[in-house]
Amino acid sequence: MTPFFWLKENSKFEVETEIQKSSIPDAGKGRFILEHIKKGQLIRKLKLINIKDYIDILKLNENDDTNYFIIFNNYNDLDLVVEYFKSFNLLDEDEIKLKISWFIATIDNKLYIQSHSSYYNHSSDSNIKRVFEKEYIYHYASKDIDKNNELFIDYNDYNMPEYYLKWCKNNNIQDILSFL
């Protein structure tokens, strides 16, 4: 079992999906829908959990494969997750920080990362609407999506908190929005 969220693909979707080569050149992998879905249909629902609680869960059961959206409340939380992943001695610190910067997202001023990769790539013509409600984030189809189409989120919707931008700058890492 890998502790690294970017290597986990079991993302608990409500519809059938598959990871394939992205339709975007040089983007790597993407997630594709294997059935036609209608606008407004639930694609995914995941619970939000604080990074400290997530680490405690894994310390109790390193094989826990529950998928979460992991919340970072401040600069120190970002350093905490780096230290946790360093303890596995599988990647160096710079590689871990880079991966974190690639997989970070926000909703309603909450900075989070997924415990399993979604493989959603960026498109300004996204087909996923994200909704934050209580302790969950829901992903709905923002339009009808035909079978075998790739799922996209518009990264421009992310409102990155200042502590994340400062963390990236202090670690000489590009934040995800600077790639757009």
Where do the language-model regions lie?
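Conserved catalytic SET/PR domain of SAM-dependent protein methyltransferases, capturing the structural core
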Residues: M1-L180
